[in-house]
């Protein structure tokens, strides 16, 4: 079970099998925020953006995660700009993304969201039945899944600075 405990939008999902038993899954889908798509590489490229939104492994053996991510990217349609996040609250740095040559583009700002009394995120104003829930900073990674020429072109259109990988 994934720690986020919510079902994201899933457009593509790939499994990792060991002796015909599912032991891992990676999924990709539309990012929750349309403004995120536009913010990454502009209006012209917003439909190319997808999010690696879940990665779950039963055993989490050495290199298992990066192998699953790397092989699944090869199965995605091109060109795509893949964005994913490593949650600092979970002590994630993003080593999987670093191992699969994602580009590090900084860390989001911590913030608070409005949630209902049950603690779940709400996009609706619920009056006094709401509370503020802390959302931790996340490391943002992107991967340009395209041929060499398209990749070079898309890299020039990325709106974020490419930075050194974070380490812990």
Q: What is the predicted function of each stretch?
A:
Residues 143-152:
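C-terminal accessory regions of radical SAM enzymes
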Residues 152-168:
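Short, cationic low-complexity segments
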Residues 29-133, 143:
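Acyl-donor binding region in acyl/amide transferases
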């Amino acid at each position: 079970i994934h720690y986020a405990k919510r079902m994201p939008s899933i457009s593509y999902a790939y499994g990792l099998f060991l002796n015909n038993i599912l032991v891992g899954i990676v999924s990709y889908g539309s990012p929750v925020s349309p403004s995120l798509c536009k913010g990454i590489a502009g209006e012209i490229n917003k439909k190319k953006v997808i999010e690696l939104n879940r990665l779950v492994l039963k055993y989490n053996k050495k290199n298992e995660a990066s192998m699953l991510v790397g092989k699944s990217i090869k199965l995605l349609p091109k060109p795509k700009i893949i964005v994913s996040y490593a949650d600092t609250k979970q002590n994630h740095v993003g080593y999987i993304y670093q191992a699969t040559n994602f580009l590090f583009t900084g860390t989001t700002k911590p913030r608070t969201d409005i949630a209902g009394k049950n603690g779940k995120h709400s996009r609706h104003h619920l009056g006094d039945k709401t509370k503020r829930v802390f959302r931790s900073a996340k490391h943002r990674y992107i991967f340009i899944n395209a041929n060499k020429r398209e990749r070079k072109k898309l890299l020039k259109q990325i709106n974020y600075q490419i930075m050194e990988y974070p380490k812990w």
